[in-house]
Amino acid sequence: MAGSSIPAQLLAAIKGRKYTSIARLFANPVDFQGWTPTGHWVATDPQTAARIIEVWFSPGGSASTITWSNETSTTKFGTLEYEIAWQAQPDDQPRVLRQAYILTFKGDKIAAARVYCAGLHTEFPEVDLEKQRRQKGLGGLKPAPSSPRAIAVKAV
């Protein structure tokens, strides 16, 4: 994978379920932290970070695939976002999980990673902002309060 960005290498290893390759992308020690609906995940070594990703990418033991991804990278920082989809038993309902990685690099290794997960969904529908505002009692724009009148004062 020479020439590929670190986020692209991480994505390729996740897609290929190559968890040993994932571990090789992390520095030792690494500052790896992830927040999911399950809890706060922490790793300080590459092997544990890779095992955490393995657990995340193996939902329910059924076949899962990355259906969407996006990566960005500079020499010191990068991001990786992806959606994992699979069918949940017993009635093959679709499930989607989105994760976002914020990465810090030291040389050609990931020195720090912050991973955020939006939680389990059947889909990610567009949000109706105005409906959400109404439900929270935020309604429309409120008129500005009237300010007191300015009165001209004559200097004597």
Pin down the residues of each PLM region.
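A solvent-exposed, acidic/Ser-Thr-rich amphipathic alpha-helical stretch
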Residues: Y19-F77
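A beta-strand edge to alpha-helix "cap/lid" segment located at domain peripheries
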Residues: F57-V156
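Hydrophobic alpha-helical core bundles mediating ligand binding, dimerization, or RNAP-core interactions
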Residues: P7, I14, F26, A49, ...
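Short, mixed-charge, low-aromatic patches
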Residues: S4-A13, G39-H40, W56-P59, P145-S147
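Short acidic-aromatic low-complexity motifs
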Residues: A2-P29
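Soluble or luminal CAZymes and related metallo-dependent hydrolases
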Residues: A2, I6, T48, R95
